[in-house]
């Protein structure tokens, strides 16, 4: 029997070390290993990387993190080259260990009390008009990190009064009442929380999370702020069916969610959950049509769509795919 990993505070555990800590083991079959990316999944890198390096330098200067880098997002080059990034607060170590995600797992250090001001200054220096703030899960904090979100929102608005802020929040497991009390006092312009996938395979995809809890979080925020758009997204290609995706979309509408994102799951490493299928652009178009027919005010559905992909355009109701 192998010895359990003793996690040191502040150390990032990735790939095999991270997956070894997950109770539900995922076996990669020969078919999974041979599944190749179709033509529509090939990415063109920009010829000039000057702006990409500039954003990375600004992040490093202030000790900030982007989910684009930490989660190995396939759109990093495109977004950075257009001068946009999704900031990840509360450190770069997550207390969860979801097998689809490339963010490191471990025992995080205490939140940086200066991060809200550093973040606000960086955003002001970049002259951003729309910003997405997300975080790792912080199950070690009594409020799940909600107060830190609120502090960041307050600091950003103080330096950039005209900016629009979207928050992509964790589920605040076991701390919903306290978290919503804080966030209701300092609400963002868009409230986003991702369901990620369908209930049937939740235990494999999101160990430690609960489908109905996440729906309730979205619903309760919407009840408190009916004027603020609520948003959620799924990764597809993890073993779900299109019919199951449609049913999740119905659940989201029943809980007041008005904006939707659907994108193709990509395996960060051979240690993560394998891709079970590649969903075609035509299928994404069909699901978008279904979403709009259900009453979503905006639906971004396509192979490379991620929750914060061109989030400013999504908020304006413009086409994103």
Swiss-Prot record:
Cofactor: binding comment: Binds 2 [4Fe-4S] clusters per subunit. One cluster is coordinated with 3 cysteines and an exchangeable S-adenosyl-L-methionine.
Major localization listed first in the record, in broad terms: cytoplasm
Names of the cofactor(s): [4Fe-4S] cluster
Residues involved in [4Fe-4S] cluster 2 binding: 94, 98, 101
Pathway stated in the Swiss-Prot or TrEMBL entry: Protein modification; protein lipoylation via endogenous pathway; protein N(6)-(lipoyl)lysine from octanoyl-[acyl-carrier-protein]: step 2/2
Pfam families in alphabetical order: LIAS_N, Radical_SAM
Keyword Transport: no
InterPro entries per record: Aldolase_TIM (IPR013785), Elp3/MiaA/NifB-like_rSAM (IPR006638), LIAS_N (IPR031691), Lipoyl_synth (IPR003698), rSAM (IPR007197)
EC code: 2.8.1.8
Residues covered by the Radical SAM core domain: 80-297
Catalytic activity, as annotated: [[Fe-S] cluster scaffold protein carrying a second [4Fe-4S](2+) cluster] + N(6)-octanoyl-L-lysyl-[protein] + 2 oxidized [2Fe-2S]-[ferredoxin] + 2 S-adenosyl-L-methionine + 4 H(+) = [[Fe-S] cluster scaffold protein] + N(6)-[(R)-dihydrolipoyl]-L-lysyl-[protein] + 4 Fe(3+) + 2 hydrogen sulfide + 2 5'-deoxyadenosine + 2 L-methionine + 2 reduced [2Fe-2S]-[ferredoxin]
Keywords: 4Fe-4S, Cytoplasm, Iron, Iron-sulfur, Metal-binding, S-adenosyl-L-methionine, Transferase
Gene Ontology cellular-component terms listed: cytoplasm
UniProt: [4Fe-4S] cluster 1 binding residues: 68, 73, 79, 308
Gene Ontology MF: a single term: metal ion binding
Compartments reported by the entry: Cytoplasm
Family in the record: Belongs to the radical SAM superfamily. Lipoyl synthase family.
HAMAP family found in the cross-reference section: Lipoyl_synth
Protein name from the UniProt record: Lipoyl synthase
Lineage, broadest ranks: Bacteria, Pseudomonadati, Pseudomonadota, Gammaproteobacteria, Enterobacterales
Gene: lipA
